[in-house]
Amino acid sequence: MKFGLFIAFAFPLFALDGVVVNVTTGKPQAGVAINLVQPSQNGMNQLGATTSGAQGDFKIDKQIPPGPGLIQATYQGTTYNMIITPGTPTTGVQVQVYDSTKKAGVAKTLEHLILIEPGPDNIKISETFVLGNESKATFNDPAKGSIQFYLPDSTGGKAQVVITAPGGMPIRRPPVKTPSAGIYKIDYPAIHFLRKGTQ
């Protein structure tokens, strides 16, 4: 019994509540899938899940071990992340989402860099795209992708793709072949950001 009480105090009840706001419309957003996860050595541990209500409200009552948590809000095919660090208020949290669009021109290529590094047996080519999106919408076109690029047949379609959003962690994605010969795409949303960033 004492052991059970000790565990209860060591891992206090973590009540997370707040509202989801659609920045595109400026209104609370209903029907957004909310997941509370925590990073671990074995990946992400899901701690709780819910869906935002009619007024965009959500609440998750869950015990959480010490350390940061991560709110993942999925809306119109895009997942928005918000880190909850120890000591950060967990009530009245505002999670922001955006309407998604396939409209061309919402996300723009600000820079396109190619680095060629010759080696003893091969040539390493690094291609970098810097995207910008200053609209109040997320560019998300799974059919065409956010970026398309060419890979020679000699690569066998093998390329390392790393996506880094402003203030975010690097994310690896496999290139996806399109119907056009040698053309591959990256299916990853271009989320709104005001300052130049990389993706």
Annotate each predicted stretch with a short phrase.
Residues 16-199:
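Lumenal/extracellular ectodomains and adaptor appendage modules
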Residues 2-13:
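Bacterial N-terminal signal peptides
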